[in-house]
């Protein structure tokens, strides 16, 4: 298989796996996944707000997920690992699912979007953006954007420091798409710099001034030295 075709195949497979896990682990607070190739097989790391639901009673759920990944998605020797999300407010996928659930429960989109932005920024994030698109209030589709703080939209920083999440809210009027972007507090911004404090300079040593000694002192020292040498010789 050509290397270009392999990249495309792996990308399509990852999208299918992401969609499958999002649907199966919705109650567990699914927060994303990572697939890495290892000498023993394929390491699949699942991030969830409630890892106990992902594992299931006696590990039943995680064994079923492992079997589905191997049979339905052609993942070679999958090894599923579940990690708990430390701070869900910094996970874009979890916050997008929460916002979609709020819209499905009947929250007004402005209130839901503003509440999500406020919760993320109060947790210490450097920036956040929420985009809600669909039939929000009437028969026509529209897009509403909420932004606060620092957000990068292009270039390498938009791929490395911006967390992205997407979810769908199914309502009577139609489907509403929700997109959340978060810049976590530990992100290294491209224009950030550190100011180093100058080291304290040591005070220069004071010059030692030679003491003025008279001829009498030299004569006394010479006489004492001569007497000591004379005693030693005797």
Swiss-Prot record:
GO BP term (any one): translation
Keywords of the record: Ribonucleoprotein, Ribosomal protein, RNA-binding, rRNA-binding
Occurrences of domain KH type-2 (ranges): 17-86
Any single Gene Ontology cellular-component annotation: cytosolic small ribosomal subunit
Keyword rRNA-binding tagged: yes
SMART domains listed in its UniProt record: KH
Top-rank taxon: Archaea
GO molecular function: rRNA binding; structural constituent of ribosome
Similarity annotation: Belongs to the universal ribosomal protein uS3 family.
Function: Binds the lower part of the 30S subunit head.
Assembly description: Part of the 30S ribosomal subunit.
Stored PANTHER family: 30S/40S RIBOSOMAL PROTEIN S3, SMALL RIBOSOMAL SUBUNIT PROTEIN US3
Protein name: Small ribosomal subunit protein uS3
Organism of derivation: Methanoculleus marisnigri (strain ATCC 35101 / DSM 1498 / JR1)
């Amino acid at each position: 298989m050509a290397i270009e075709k392999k990249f495309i195949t792996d990308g399509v497979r990852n999208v299918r796996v992401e969609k499958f896990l999002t649907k199966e682990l919705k109650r567990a607070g699914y927060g994303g996944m990572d697939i890495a190739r290892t000498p023993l097989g394929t390491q699949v790391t699942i991030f969830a707000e409630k890892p106990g639901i992902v594992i299931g009673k006696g590990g039943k759920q995680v064994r079923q997920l492992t079997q589905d990944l191997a049979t339905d998605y052609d993942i070679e020797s999958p090894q599923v690992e579940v990690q708990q999300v430390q701070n869900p407010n910094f996970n874009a996928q979890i916050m997008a699912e929460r916002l979609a659930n709020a819209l499905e429960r009947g929250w007004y989109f402005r209130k839901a979007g503003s509440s999500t932005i406020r919760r993320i920024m109060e947790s210490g994030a450097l920036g956040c953006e929420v985009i809600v698109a669909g039939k929000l209030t009437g028969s026509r589709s529209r897009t509403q954007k909420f932004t606060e703080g620092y957000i990068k939209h292009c270039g390498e920083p938009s791929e490395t420091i911006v967390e992205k999440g997407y979810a769908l809210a199914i309502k009577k009027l139609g489907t509403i798409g929700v997109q959340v972007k978060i810049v976590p507090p530990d992100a290294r911004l491209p224009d950030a710099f550190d100011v180093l404090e100058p080291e304290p300079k040591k005070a220069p040593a004071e010059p030692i001034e030679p003491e003025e000694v008279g001829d009498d002192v030299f004569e006394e020292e010479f006489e004492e030295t001569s007497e000591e040498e004379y005693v030693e010789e005797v």
